[in-house]
């Protein structure tokens, strides 16, 4: 039993380390590398403090949303975002009350903000590619697996909560 617990902790630590590296190191590095290869003048906007500030706010909003989802996965779902150690409980509170995939929304917002901060057209393109891949993964892999694992509870959840972007007026469950 202790080996399984240690394995779970190692997977959890590696997951968080990979998320950190992907967000703060790998994505800007890949964006800048692609900019150097394909764009002679890789500036999205003219130098503007307002663009920098707004982009930074969008990025930190995405980071905050991503961190919130990880905390909710750990505390309420008793698991991690890693499919090797998934939540045991269906998580439908916190940010999941408004979006079935707030972690994806947070990751997209972070990349989008990062692309503005670094003024990287390639990073903006990677953000869009990230969104497309997450959409396909969600529809074709995640949702069928969650329907199998959680059955009618998940189906009811899908009926009341939008897949990605929250609506201004949530449907009333009662």
Q: Where on the chain are the PLM-derived regions?
A:
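Extended, alpha-helix-rich binding/interface surfaces that flank or overlap catalytic cores
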Residues: 101
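Membrane-anchoring alpha-helices and their flanking helix-loop junctions
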Residues: 1-93, 105-145, 149-174
């Amino acid at each position: 039993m202790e080996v399984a617990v240690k394995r779970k902790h190692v997977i959890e630590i590696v997951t968080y380390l990979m998320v950190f590296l992907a967000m703060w190191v790998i994505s800007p590095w890949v964006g800048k590398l692609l900019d150097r290869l394909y764009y002679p003048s890789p500036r999205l906007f003219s130098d503007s403090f307002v663009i920098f500030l707004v982009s930074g706010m969008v990025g930190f909003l995405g980071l905050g949303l991503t961190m919130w989802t990880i905390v909710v996965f750990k505390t309420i779902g008793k698991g991690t975002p890693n499919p090797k150690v998934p939540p045991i409980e269906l998580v439908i509170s916190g940010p999941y009350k408004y979006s079935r995939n707030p972690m994806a929304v947070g990751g997209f917002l972070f990349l989008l903000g990062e692309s503005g901060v670094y003024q990287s057209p390639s990073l903006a393109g990677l953000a869009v590619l990230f969104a497309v891949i997450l959409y396909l993964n969600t529809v074709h892999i995640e949702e069928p697996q969650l329907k199998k694992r959680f059955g009618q509870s998940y189906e009811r959840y899908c009926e009341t909560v939008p897949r990605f972007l929250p609506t201004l007026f949530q449907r009333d469950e009662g």
